[in-house]
Amino acid sequence: MNPQESAQGTWEQESPRTALDVVYIEWHVHPFRAERWFEIWEPGAARAMAFGAKGWSLTRNVEDPLHFRQASVWEIRDDFERYWYSDEVSALREEAVNYYNKPLLPVWHVLIAGE
């Protein structure tokens, strides 16, 4: 990257074949339902590994304890689609449907730095 590109905030992306993708899902849980939602959903989030995820996490917002963020890292986006729409994960979402606000919109990021 030349200095002019750096000053403009542009950067060169890795080839799509070597870059990892991170998908975030923002869960907004109904009051008094967070613990039950977590009991239902945590096994579903963990199932991402069985579908090819390189890692996953669930975090809870300190300032808004009803806001959870699910993150998972993927080499192949289609693997996330297989995970998200699998019978098992779909059933868990259905079981938890009364505990969170809809819709859920996965948002993709490209991992550009990290360990």
Task: List PLM regions with ranges.
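Glycine-rich beta-strand-turn "strand-cap" elements at beta-sheet edges
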Residues: M1-D21, G55-H67, L92-E115
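Generic alpha-helical hydrophobic packing signal
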Residues: L20, P31, F38-E42, A71-V73, ...
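Short, well-ordered beta-strand segments in beta-rich or mixed alpha/beta enzyme
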Residues: D21-H28, S57-S86
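A general secondary-structure boundary signal
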Residues: Y24-H28, A34, H109
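Short amphipathic alpha-helical segments
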Residues: R33-G55, E88-L92
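A beta-strand edge to alpha-helix "cap/lid" segment located at domain peripheries
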Residues: F38, A46, R82-W84, K102, ...
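Anionic, Ser/Thr-rich low-complexity intrinsically disordered regions
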Residues: M49, I76, F80-Y99
